């Protein structure tokens, strides 16, 4: 994670940038400096999972009671010190970082293979050096923290950007995590979670200002350094030859430096002594070997610019950024500019604006001086104060607006000047809504074309003016142009929405009504909380008016910014999308918003033995459930399309090279009374709707016929029974002994304290039990998905693992059951548990019999169970799917047009 080699460099070459600090003292200082303001730490939760998971056992599926207790202690310690914690989780994987995500998943696969090899050889858990976090840890940590009353947020993009942005905008005490990217962002202080001593609240602060002093750079140069070294966006090998050229020049005058540390020092030296000379005179691609990677490089640099920040290394057009607090922020990232650092002139005095010089950079940076308040606004400040955007103040609104210059023609781009200036501003003003619209100048015909920017100026869209109505209609970029174009804006969720052309698979734009009675500004300052125009039905009707024009000149690929990715919206209902987005941001759902917005989801590694052909991967087992959920969530989309939609699944399973996502189609389901709409499931508060929610949930598991039996089961075992029925119907190699172990551990868990679970030690580690434990936990995460998609018919606490599963306890029961121990022994001679055990077992077995699945012990297995999963002739999707394992093979291998075609072999593991 983070910048390649920077963590090691800091530890070996620049240890002085690490300072031991105490959170209690920092909090006290913060309170005295900002009275009435609670000291707040933004926590990058994904970086902290390894630190938080303190239980000794991790191989058996997770010690969830112990883990929950550790989280509670963590929260209590900071609360006692008067420190508020805000937890951020990754809500999605950005496309720019997909390759890095895949690389890590494949690396994890190799680690898992070594883990299972060790287990089979030693029959014990490997040492902590082979530690692998239990499956579902990130998902359930969100719910654990919410249960503990903590503010928990799920990101709409990569979490590190939102963490850094939140910390800067809310004047936080600092960021707690373990990612060197936080040394690159110009934000609040960065503290290490790995160095945290919870008892004393001591940790290490990594100071980016001291890092800059050591490297001879200023904070604004760090994104350039990070991209030249390699990060999650820029592959490490992209500039390898360039780095070694820098190293050759550097080592010729320096001696006795280690190679790795030398590279970072050498690249920094090249930036400060060579690149500085050309700054403002040449573009980066003229002084760096960017080649075909120019767009990616600029995108990597722009990804570090927080709302309101600019880079002195390239000039940017303002782009709208949506943060979790629904604030629309202006950032910019025009890489095609001349990189001239603009000078602002006082409109009255015509004086040139003074320059400010950073302490280490030895270069001048312009500032703009407002004629009235005489307040200097630096473009690039020294490392201590925060970096600001040069702004002009409009004569009426007194609102600060970032300035920009047109890079190609020598024509001034729309600027606003001081109140005394009598300078004409090249702005297009709609006389009715008083909406300022910047003009777009085509460099070839030299003809001015009005541009539509909307309230979130992410991307300029050429406007077509009708000859009669004089109404501006947004132009549609055809499928050949391969250009992503901004479409409608969700009025309340502040999210930009895209829809997909079903044949071209291109993103089709829809714009807000251009004659809306609302003001659309060209750009906004970071502190302006600008409201978006309210969307109307007319926006959708504009689709029919949009004309295809493949001739439209594409915007330069270097015009990128750290905004939320423009998404292919699978669902067009903005009200439902708003609800889904809210649940997503508040960490109340799992995958639902990803499915509805982008139609793309992922699932990380699971402890699965790739050599065990008898147990299928959890990705396959739970796929039919996900397909039915897709049918529910995307029903609105399917009504208006002639071709069936497909969701892109990046699920890790043995043998999957992850070169492409699996294209998975929705699977229709039969629900008593018909499939209810999402508005009914999510928004209708009538008591009778709860029955329909439960019917829908059971239909997702294809268990509508077992509704009465499941309703008779008491909490919290209802959800567990539903999951066990599904598992045993789907996987024929699960036997009666497995069922006994699953039920026994759930019952015994209810009477165990955390200390009892800590002291529990299985006789040895069985690789099959390891995989079964992970399989059940992945089933619980699937329950989170289904429950949230259906409007929460069940209490979330009923299927939280700390209430129904413990890894070591399950392992113990599995080993006992495998050896043929009596049920009374499994239940620890507790008679009350015995009655519940037989009731739960009866419910599962009866439901399975309805699906023609008889659960037997291992002694009754025939030869067809050896090394294969599934019974010949049984339907994988069971009732109502039309697929059969014996006749059709695995149905997900043929997903129709546009999907990858797979070999027609029902047992082939990719």
Swiss-Prot record:
Signal peptide: none annotated. Residues 335-351, 360-375, 396-411, 901-910 have a biased composition (Basic and acidic residues). Gene3D superfamilies: 5'-nuclease. GO terms for biological process: fat cell differentiation; peroxisome proliferator activated receptor signaling pathway. The keyword Cell membrane does not apply. Interacts with ESR1 and RXRA. Interacts with PPARG; in a ligand-independent manner. Functions as a transactivator of PPARG and ESR1. Functions in adipogenesis through PPARG activation. This is Constitutive coactivator of peroxisome proliferator-activated receptor gamma. It comes from Homo sapiens (Human).
């Amino acid at each position: 994670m983070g910048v390649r080699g920077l963590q090691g460099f800091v530890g070996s070459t620049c240890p002085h940038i690490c300072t031991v600090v105490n959170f209690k003292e920092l909090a006290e200082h913060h309170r005295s400096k900002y009275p009435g303001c609670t000291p707040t730490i933004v926590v990058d939760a994904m970086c902290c999972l390894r630190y938080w998971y303190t239980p000794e056992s991790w191989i058996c599926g997770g010690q969830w009671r112990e883990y929950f207790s550790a989280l509670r202690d963590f929260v209590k310690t900071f609360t006692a010190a008067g420190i508020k914690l805000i937890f951020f989780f990754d809500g999605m994987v950005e496309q720019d970082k997909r390759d890095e995500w895949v690389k890590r998943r494949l690396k994890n696969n190799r680690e898992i293979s070594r883990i299972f090899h060790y287990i089979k050889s030693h029959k014990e858990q490997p040492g902590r050096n082979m530690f692998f976090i239990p499956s579902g840890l990130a998902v359930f940590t969100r719910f654990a923290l919410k249960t503990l009353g903590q503010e928990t947020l799920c990101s709409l993009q990569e979490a590190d950007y939102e963490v850094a942005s939140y910390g800067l905008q809310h004047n936080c005490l600092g960021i707690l995590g373990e990612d060197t990217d936080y040394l690159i962002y110009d934000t609040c202080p960065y503290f290490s979670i790995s160095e945290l001593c919870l008892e004393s609240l001591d940790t290490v602060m990594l100071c980016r200002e001291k890092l800059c002093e050591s490297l001879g750079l200023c904070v604004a140069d760090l994104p350039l350094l990070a991209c030249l070294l390699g990060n999650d966006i820029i592959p490490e090998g992209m500039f390898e030859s360039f780095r070694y050229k820098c190293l050759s020049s550097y080592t010729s005058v320096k001696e006795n430096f280690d190679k790795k540390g030398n590279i970072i020092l050498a690249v920094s030296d090249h930036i400060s002594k060579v690149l500085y000379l050309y700054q403002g005179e040449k573009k980066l691609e003229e002084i760096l070997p960017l080649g075909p990677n120019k767009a990616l490089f600029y995108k990597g640099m722009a990804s570090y610019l927080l709302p309101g920040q600019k880079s002195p290394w390239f000039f940017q057009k303002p782009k709208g950024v949506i943060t979790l607090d629904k604030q629309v922020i202006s950032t910019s990232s025009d890489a095609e500019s001349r990189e001239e650092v603009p000078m602002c002139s006082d409109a009255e005095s015509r004086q040139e604006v003074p320059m400010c010089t950073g302490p280490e950079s030895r270069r001048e940076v312009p500032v703009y001086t407002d004629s009235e308040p005489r307040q200097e606004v630096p473009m690039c400040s020294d490392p201590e104060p925060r970096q600001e955007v040069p702004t002009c103040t409009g004569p009426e609104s007194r609102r600060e607006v970032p300035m920009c210059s047109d890079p190609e023609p020598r024509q001034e781009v729309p600027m606003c000047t001081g109140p005394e200036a009598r300078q004409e501003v090249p702005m297009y003003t709609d006389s009715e809504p008083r909406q300022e619209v910047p003009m777009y100048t085509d460099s070839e015909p030299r003809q001015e074309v009005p541009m539509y920017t909307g309230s979130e100026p992410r991307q300029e869209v050429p406007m077509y003016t009708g000859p009669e109505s004089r109404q501006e209609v947004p132009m549609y970029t055809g499928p050949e142009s391969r250009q992503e174009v901004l479409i409608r804006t969700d009025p309340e969720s502040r999210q930009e929405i895209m829809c997909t052309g079903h044949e071209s698979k291109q993103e089709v734009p829809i714009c807000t009504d251009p004659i809306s009675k609302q003001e659309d500004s060209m750009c906004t300052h970071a502190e302006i909380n600008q409201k978006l125009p309210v969307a109307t039905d007319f926006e959708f009707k504009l689709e029919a008016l949009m004309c295809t024009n493949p001739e439209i000149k594409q915007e330069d690929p270097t015009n990128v910014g750290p905004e939320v990715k423009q998404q292919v919206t699978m669902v067009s209902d903005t009200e439902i999308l708003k609800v889904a987005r809210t649940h997503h941001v508040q960490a109340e759902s799992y995958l639902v918003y990803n499915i509805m917005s982008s139609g793309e989801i992922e699932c990380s590694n699971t402890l699965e033995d790739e050599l065990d052909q008898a147990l299928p991967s959890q990705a396959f087992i739970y796929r039919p459930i996900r397909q039915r959920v897709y049918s529910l969530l995307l029903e609105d989309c399917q009504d208006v399309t002639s071709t069936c939609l497909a969701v892109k699944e990046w699920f890790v399973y043995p043998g999957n090279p992850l070169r492409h996502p699996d294209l998975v189609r929705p699977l229709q389901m039969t629900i008593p009374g018909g499939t209810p709409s999402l508005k009914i499931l999510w928004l209708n508060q009538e008591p009778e709707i709860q029955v329909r929610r439960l019917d829908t949930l059971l239909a997702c598991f294809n268990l509508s016929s077992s509704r009465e039996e499941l309703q008779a089961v008491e909490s919290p075992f209802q959800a567990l029974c539903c999951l066990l029925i599904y598992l045993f119907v789907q996987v024929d190699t699960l036997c009666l002994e497995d069922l006994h172990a699953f039920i026994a551990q759930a019952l015994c868990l209810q009477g165990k304290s955390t200390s009892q679970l800590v002291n529990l030690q299985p006789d040895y580690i069985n690789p099959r039990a390891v995989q079964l434990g992970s399989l059940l936990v992945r089933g619980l995460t699937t329950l989170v998905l289904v429950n949230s998609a259906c409007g929460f018919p069940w209490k979330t606490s009923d299927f939280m693992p700390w209430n129904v599963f413990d890894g070591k306890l399950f392992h113990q029961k599995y080993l006992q059951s495998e050896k043929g121990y009596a049920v009374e022994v499994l239940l620890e001679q507790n008679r009350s548990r015995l009655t519940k055990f037989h009731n739960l077992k009866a419910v599962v077995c009866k439901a399975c019999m309805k699906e023609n699945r008889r659960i037997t012990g291992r002694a009754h297995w025939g030869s067809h169970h050896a090394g294969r999963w599934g019974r010949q002739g049984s339907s994988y999707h069971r009732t109502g799917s039309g697929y059969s394992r014996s006749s059709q093979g695995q149905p997900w291998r043929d997903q129709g047009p546009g999907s990858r075609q797979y070999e027609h072999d029902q047992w082939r593991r990719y």
